[in-house]
């Protein structure tokens, strides 16, 4: 195992020094996980899209001088439903139109972090 996505401690990846290897923590968020948002908090599909955009706006501004990670935890069986998907699509289209944004995966964040910082 090279990395985990269990800690909500930071918007940056960070390294754990372990006896066998350097384990990377790739950021994770509970706030932008659609299952708790819809089922526990009861937000609407539109509100979830707005939450993504609002979080992005803050992190994009903060990231102007120091890059940030913004994980969005999704499950296709849930947010992939047509009544929910249109607002997710709206949020991704909003994010994608900004400069210096990398839409990526945890694997790629791990690879990038190891190349740059270890």
Give the location of each predicted region.
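C-terminal domain-boundary segment and adjacent tail
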Residues: 53-118
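Active-site-adjacent pocket scaffolds in enzyme catalytic domains
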Residues: 1-66
């Amino acid at each position: 195992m090279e990395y985990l996505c269990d800690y909500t401690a930071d918007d940056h990846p960070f390294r754990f020094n372990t006896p066998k290897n350097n384990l990377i923590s790739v950021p994770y968020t509970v706030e932008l996980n659609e299952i708790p948002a819809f089922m526990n908090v009861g937000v609407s599909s539109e509100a979830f899209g707005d939450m993504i955009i609002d979080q992005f706006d803050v992190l994009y501004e903060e990231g102007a001088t120091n890059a940030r990670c913004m994980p969005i935890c999704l499950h296709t069986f849930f947010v992939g439903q047509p009544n929910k998907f249109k607002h997710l699509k709206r949020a991704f289209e909003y994010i994608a139109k900004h400069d210096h944004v990398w839409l990526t995966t945890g694997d790629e964040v791990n690879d990038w972090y190891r190349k740059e910082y270890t």
